[in-house]
Each structure stands twice: as C-alpha cells, then as structure tokens.
C-alpha cells in the first residue's frame, strides 16, 4: 500500500511540472528565434561610422568610451535602492490593515535601516558634488 501511494504521489508531482517544463521549452525557443531573427532579416551595413554614437545629426565631439565620474554611478545606485524601497512599501500600504501589528513593526525596522543608511551617506559626503 505504501509503495503504490509513493508512486502515485511521484506521478502526480511529475504531471504538475510537465506544464512548467513545456512553458520553459517554449520560452527558450521563442527567445532563440527572437535573437536570431535580426541576423537574417536586418540589412547589413559596412559603413565606417556604423558603430559610432549618434549626437543629433552633428559630428562626434569626443570618443564614445568617455570616462564618467564615479559619483554618477553612486547616485544611480542610491536611486535604485530608494526606488526599491518605494516598490516594497506599495504592497504593504495596500494590505496594511490585514497584516496586523507585526507587519507594521517589520516595515518600521525596514524604514529605520534605510534611513540610517541615507543619513550615513549624507554625513559621509557621498551626495556632495564638490
């Protein structure tokens, strides 16, 4: 009796994942087709300026591989961090009443940690452009 139930459970699990596997195979096939399609359809151009950046119809002013200040990357990372904070807060705000006080405390701890990080960045001068 035990062996037949184990086999039945194993068969049931495999049947559940057949659709996931089929979805994965179809997604991989469509992705490969989409990646290969431009190779066959797009016209090929062998001009000298093909890889250059386009600056509103004007000639290039400098090389494309120009160096950026590290502060641009720092501000970008900070933007992503605080943008993700807002993304995490929206679902919580929608269902705050149903979640109860434990969820409120966890979100409060989350906000305190992010605020401490922001104060540290501000005090250390990471946001100054001097």
Curated annotation (Swiss-Prot):
Its EC number is 7.1.1.-. It is found in: Cell inner membrane. The keyword Lipid metabolism does not apply. It is a multi-pass membrane protein. It catalyses: a quinone + NADH + 5 H(+)(in) = a quinol + NAD(+) + 4 H(+)(out). Its main location: membrane. It is an enzyme of class 7 (translocase). Keywords: Cell inner membrane, Cell membrane, Membrane, NAD, Quinone, Translocase, Transmembrane, Transmembrane helix, Transport, Ubiquinone. One of its GO terms (cellular component) is NADH dehydrogenase complex. Pfam families: Oxidored_q4. The chain crosses the membrane at residues 17-37, 74-94, 99-119. Coiled coil: none annotated. One of its GO terms (molecular function) is quinone binding. NDH-1 is composed of 14 different subunits. Subunits NuoA, H, J, K, L, M, N constitute the membrane sector of the complex. Belongs to the complex I subunit 3 family. NDH-1 shuttles electrons from NADH, via FMN and iron-sulfur (Fe-S) centers, to quinones in the respiratory chain. The immediate electron acceptor for the enzyme in this species is believed to be ubiquinone. Couples the redox reaction to proton translocation (for every two electrons transferred, four hydrogen ions are translocated across the cytoplasmic membrane), and thus conserves the redox energy in a proton gradient. This is NADH-quinone oxidoreductase subunit A. It comes from Neorickettsia sennetsu (strain ATCC VR-367 / Miyayama). The gene is nuoA.
